[in-house]
Amino acid sequence: MSQQSHVHGVAGLKKHDIKVSGIVFMLYCLVGAGAFGIEEMIPESGPGMTLILLTVFPVVWAYPISNLTAECGSLMPSEGGVYVWVKEAFGEFWGFQAGWWGTVSTYITNGVYVTLVTGYVSQLIPMSEISLHVLRIGMVLIFTVINLFGIKEVGKVSTVLSVLIVLAFALVSIVGFMNWNTSPVEPMMPEGYNLLDSIGNGICICVWMYCGYECISNMAGEVKNPQVIPKGLMIAMPIVALTYILPTIAGLATLPSGSWMDWATDGGFGNETVGYATVLTQNLGNIWGYIFLLVAIVSQCAIFNTYMASGSRGFFVLADDNLCPRFMVRISRKRGVPYVGIISLAIVTLLLSQSDFTTLVSIEVVFILDLYIILSIAVIKLRKTVPVDERKKRGLYVMPGGKLGLIFFTSCPILISAVALLVNGTDYLMTGLIGTVTGPLVYIVFKRKYGGLSVDEPGRYPVNTSTKLAFGDIFRIGIFIFLLGSVTFIGQFWLRWYEIDYGGWTSSDYDMMGEFIPQILVIFKWAGLCFIAAGICIMAYGYKKDRPSSEEIVDYDYFIEKYSVNK
């Protein structure tokens, strides 16, 4: 085959026959891969509140996001997931923002899992700094090779790792329930905490523990029958929830009264803290602490494996739409996988796995919450683009509950994301908002340099020759700046009350810039006002000089056929 005949981009991807079970286990790895992380909630929120949050969040957070993903994925089972859905709803500017937020967040955090693995391994085997570097490189290389084989192999590895993790936490549940010792819900909250304190301390961790369902959609273009993804979502969600709730109840019930204050992510691994491993070491012997430490390593490997598969497709799809450097669109001849995206993610992971993650993760948190907000709004718009009746005629998945269901499924992620943004801390919000500004800046550069959607469909996506952007982009940028200013200005009132007047936070309560928080809040106030004013001016100018083109009447058959797996 000649170089010219080799197809790159989404059209050249190899499709795999992935069963529902494969999707379920990949989702399990993307979202949970065990209950590790919940340990930090227990002393911060209290045993009772932790269990309430773990039980409520599947209903008000995981179930809505799963349904949003299932409905959009059924309508548009395309590589790129949320990016494609937002692009079809609101155009390439907002689509790029969604793609940028989702992809950059994966590039930022994938190194966390490598660092956690090396930390766990060093508890088993004392290692020098050089040995740790070798271990990091070895881990990244192994899962890079697996990903280069394709998502079918990723799914097989995910299945094996998921089964091991589920069995381990099932054992924790069984042993804990058989050795019930105390009430798992007492106390409801830590002493001196009220309801707001308790919920505020746990909500961000709970959001983190139940996020990731949308990531599977990034690989939909490589699944022969992508309609298995909505089915997998509905099965994976309760499995994840049970893997969190049951072991946590069992652990709190079997460990001594008062030990809930000592829970930590490294608990039970030969130190003074406790955790899920302690349930086994206390009742079955110390050897089980080492066995469970291996499970913790497996868990982080499982997450890393699936996030490498999902995250490596982000820039690949943007490049296919001429919104990213074109070399990212290349795929391998034999396997039909986006090898440049996989290798680039591996390189960035190695570099960042040796860094301090505090600032990077603070940016990632805001990116993910922004992504859920815009996904919810896009679903509302797409309901108008392709009505429910048209979808049902074609046997596509539609969220239950009619209009009330739509309100529930879209409002819950928006409200919870907004709350999580404002209780995570001024330091995290500031770095996250600064990171968010990179989206429009990078879009302007890439759109002007590579042409965007107008390269392949100039009639549908015309370019304004004076700005070299899409018609209406100036107006959209104005909206972005206005929203950024509104969040900043309104948020500072809440943060000033929640953290200072009510909470009495000191500089030690912040992970970053604690001594500068009063000054940052002043900056929020005036910068927010400036951004609001600038956004209004830019919107007014854009509406007058760069008005968005009117929406076309949708040809439902063409729209659905465009993303049909059988096209």
Per-region residue spans from a language model:
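Transmembrane helix-boundary motif of multi-pass solute transporters/channels
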Residues: D17-G119, V207, Y213-I216, F493-D511, ...
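C-terminal membrane-solvent junction of multi-pass transporters and transport-like membrane proteins
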Residues: V157, Y193, I331-R335, Y372-L429, ...
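Membrane-interface "cap" regions at the ends of multi-pass membrane proteins
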Residues: M1-A70, S74-G80, A89, P187, ...
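Hydrophobic transmembrane alpha-helices that form the core helical bundles
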Residues: M41-E44, Y63-V140, T144-L148, E153, ...
